[in-house]
């Protein structure tokens, strides 16, 4: 990868992906795009940026051509809970945007990455140590989009020879960008509330285990997969990824090591709880580890320490300005 275009660059993953790619490949070699302008304090604005609605194929093609991109990371999407509230918009944005991005990759011979998700699984999927290849019958529009997306990426690889690569992300946890519309968002919100208010009301019930990963590990995984030897990639699209599996009570206990008086209550959201119940408790990541060396660095304990320290520092800086 030498010149990279990233869609959805202002999202939770996109923001940090842009920053990391610019560190590695050079600021001027990474074009960030999104449907809206970055805020004044966004790190994304410190380099090339263009407005892009991913459902506008002509505009996407224009940006790829003008930037002379050799790689496209397509991150723009409507997330699980938001997609369930507006399934038609979710289909139009998630699938229409992906088709446009894949067509751009085919037309301009781009290396291509897009994320899938544990949302691609469903009630009939084995819930413990979920295999790489298994039943995928999701019960949400977001999940349907992700399964279709995996199949489309594989189709473009086998039919047109497009170098497509993707991973099934678990819940991603970060202090840089606050969450927006995901089922696993409680695992980010809980840290902000712990620092700022000393208590949190979770919309996901106790005993609900979901796979999670710290954002630094997720960003490293994207870059590692994109730089991996093509000949070693047997799975290619939809690699299982996870670094840890926990429920809200486990996060509470980890936080209480630093904030002993932290309180956790529950007000379960039936929509997001229903989505969570359809996902695995834990997944098998052996293909990712074996084919391209996936090796997450953070567990719940180390992640909790980093999250709390980062939020404390962020609030200190904000209060001093």
Curated annotation (Swiss-Prot):
Q: Which InterPro entries match?
A: Epimerase_deHydtase (IPR001509), NAD(P)-bd_dom_sf (IPR036291), NAD(P)_epim/dehydratase (IPR051225)
Q: Which SUPFAM superfamilies match?
A: NAD(P)-binding Rossmann-fold domains
Q: Which GO terms describe its molecular function?
A: L-threonine 3-dehydrogenase activity
A biological process from GO: threonine catabolic process
Q: Which domain of life is it from?
A: Bacteria
**Pfam families on file:** Epimerase
Tell me which family the UniProt entry assigns to this protein.
Belongs to the NAD(P)-dependent epimerase/dehydratase family.
PANTHER family xref list: L-THREONINE 3-DEHYDROGENASE (PTHR42687), L-THREONINE 3-DEHYDROGENASE, MITOCHONDRIAL (PTHR42687:SF1)
Can you say what this protein is called? Uncharacterized epimerase/dehydratase SAR0558
Query: Which species does this protein come from?
Result: Staphylococcus aureus (strain MRSA252)
